[in-house]
Amino acid sequence: MSDLTHKIAVLGAGSWGTALAALLARHGHPTVLWGRDAAMVDTIDRTHENARYLPGIALPDSLRATTDLQAAVADATWILVVVPSHAFTETIRLIAPLRPPGAGVAWATKGFEPGSGRFLHEVARDILGPSVPLAVVTGPSFAKEVTLGLPTAITVHGDDAAFAQVVADAMHGPTFRAYTGDDMVGAELGGAMKNVLAVATGVADGMQLGLNARAGLITRGLNEMLRLAAVIGARPETLMGLAGLGDLVLTCTGDLSRNRRLGLALGRGQSLDEAIREIGQVVESVQTADEVMRQAEHHGIELPISNAVRAVLHGEITPEAGLKELLARERKPEYPQTLFT
């Protein structure tokens, strides 16, 4: 926990935005949480509870909430964006003219820009210009557990080492460890791909295929992360750390994961629409699967698990057919000889 205090604007009043805003406020930083839903934001500000996304969990009395974006970012030392990936570009555009001089921008959004498949740091850099410090906050972290003060470890990767350290220091505390790095491509890749792979393990568990199948899918899913990382310039150690393996294991095994729950529902025979309606929150994997496969096709590599998830989500094949295709694939060495060279 840093001895220095910062005024921080957290944009996005969903479960993860609320959890991070509460964490920062508890660490003594004047924190403002911005959201679009006036009724929900008013309730958070008055009652210090996000009854929709984190019911029954008390938020710090010092945490303020507002729907006024200009007021939220005014005089902010830095800004933390925590919105779904489909809203990321719009949010960055909104804050670009409002951002105080010198304020860095970090985000805990996971995914790619829908439609273009661009990494979020590319989107932010394009809109904000070359001089704004940027950082991505990622790693294995369920919002509910963070808000309850349970032990958590995350990582902050940035293109400005000093800013990444500022963000990590503000978050780091007695039960929340924050590491740093400078591989934004790898950090964002891990955070996006794990959502797709969590659907695969959820489907397998929904079909009651056993723990062996789950372990196999997680491990071969990591293989797919590493293969894509190798061709886009990410470092393998990033994917073997909190941003990759850590987030992958949590999202594939923890029932608080929306993407795993989507897979469970599909594996039990529910339709995609039924499953999303039952979850009641944004499920990033539906769009992210398309963008992952766009990247794979552009670079000419095979990602069979991710491709099967994409096909199931689009209704092109059933989960049973996807499983059959994966099991029928030609045998080959576990890792290409050139993967780590």
Swiss-Prot record:
Main enzyme class: oxidoreductase
Main localization category: cytoplasm
Residues binding sn-glycerol 3-phosphate: 110, 139, 141, 194, 247, 257-259
Catalysed reactions listed for this entry: sn-glycerol 3-phosphate + NAD(+) = dihydroxyacetone phosphate + NADH + H(+); sn-glycerol 3-phosphate + NADP(+) = dihydroxyacetone phosphate + NADPH + H(+)
Biological-process GO terms, alphabetical: carbohydrate metabolic process; glycerol-3-phosphate biosynthetic process; glycerol-3-phosphate catabolic process; glycerophospholipid biosynthetic process
Record EC number: 1.1.1.94
Functional description taken from the UniProt entry: Catalyzes the reduction of the glycolytic intermediate dihydroxyacetone phosphate (DHAP) to sn-glycerol 3-phosphate (G3P), the key precursor for phospholipid synthesis.
Name of the featured protein: Glycerol-3-phosphate dehydrogenase [NAD(P)+]
